[in-house]
Amino acid sequence: MLALRPLISALIVVSSATPLIGAPDAAGNFRAAVATVDITPSANKWLAGYPARKSTGIHDHIFHRIVALDDGRTQFFLISSDLCLFAPSVYDEMTAQLKRETGIEPIQVWWTVTHTHSAPEVGPHGLLKLMMPERYNHEPDQEYTALVEKLLIDGIKEARAKLAPARLAVGTGFSAANINRRARDVNGHISLGLNPDGPTDRQIGLIRLEHPDGTPIALIANYSMHGTALGPENTLITGDVPGTVAAYVEQKIGAPMLFINGAAGNLAPIYTVQPSFNAFHITEFDVLLGDRILAANNSLAMGTSQVRLRPSESVVETPRRAGLGWDKSLGNYLHAASGEAGTIRMPVRFLFINDEVALWSAPVELFCEISINVRDHSPYPHTFYFGYANGWLGYLPTRQAFAEGGYETQTNPFTEQVENDLTNVVIAYLEGHAR
């Protein structure tokens, strides 16, 4: 069993950029493109993330932002959608239709969400209804779900059609825009709140796609933070902090920015669950996070056109919590005989870029300590975790958090064994594929 490294309360990351060493057999063949598709509904919708409530208007529009990558042999598509979450069956349905229309395989597609809690519900309620039935006494919105899926497929086709010669650069930055949200009382009771002494991950992971002349195609910014600056009283559709910061950075650089959430399971924005936009200035995050992304971008070295992409997948099998039911649409994610709790089959995706960058993703709300531990043990100079990817199977807390209790330890189908099961598989996979 892999020992977990002790963590300090905040990970201090100095802005840095490591030039990528090009892959000789893919020299100069790299192409990239981006597409942005508006998915703002025209009617009021049930909003995800808090107790059931319907939208009453629109504060800012929400989008699919789609990047297409092509190294001459492999194409890969990364999506950031201004949504809260969706069941893995939605991803499976969308990618099956995408394959029928385009031949693109699911392994080539990562569909992440920013986790804003002020966007419409998408897809069947899945595990959420088993864990929080009081929130889901209404029917899923099949019409909006179908629209979101269609617009995404259209956007992937658009990005693919626009592929053009490009370069890729990678680096990191730092932002103190997040805070641990597992507040601890004098009696040790854990509740949702703010805990400035708790673990955080404040690294910004950055990937820049640029034209051969150096002008930007798109920026991919990876940062860990719940999309909960607005609380349940807000009923206006909004991208929350991720959408606000993306729009700010886009205005500054003249190109789209994909906000890719990270291990935000126990991390909140430092200004959180505000009742309305009148109660605070959400644009403060343009300074706290947006300007830090821009500074990290300015520190990146010139990108390389010598890029090799290696997408792959592993499956983590881990025990299911006893007494928890299962959603019939998620049969592919559970292995169990009749009457047994069985094991959950959690897909973990990887994308290796040359020999310097490892991206990994999972359909969970991961605690930041786990992502940091993987990064510390990774043989790659840059290891970024892309969270909320390809569906949602619940929170994935640490073993210590399971012992302490709290909201996240009940809103998942796992046992306290899951941290070690995931960590051991991911680190072994990274070590086994290092070159």
Identify the residue ranges that each predicted region occupies:
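N-terminal secretory signal peptides that target proteins for export/translocation
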Residues: 1-3
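Bacterial N-terminal signal peptides
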Residues: 5-19
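Conserved beta-alpha junction segments in alpha/beta enzyme cores
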Residues: 23-112, 116-258, 262-264, 270-273, ...
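Anionic-ligand-binding alpha/beta catalytic cores of soluble enzymes and soluble regulatory domains
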Residues: 289-290
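Cell wall/extracellular polymer interaction/catalysis modules
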Residues: 293
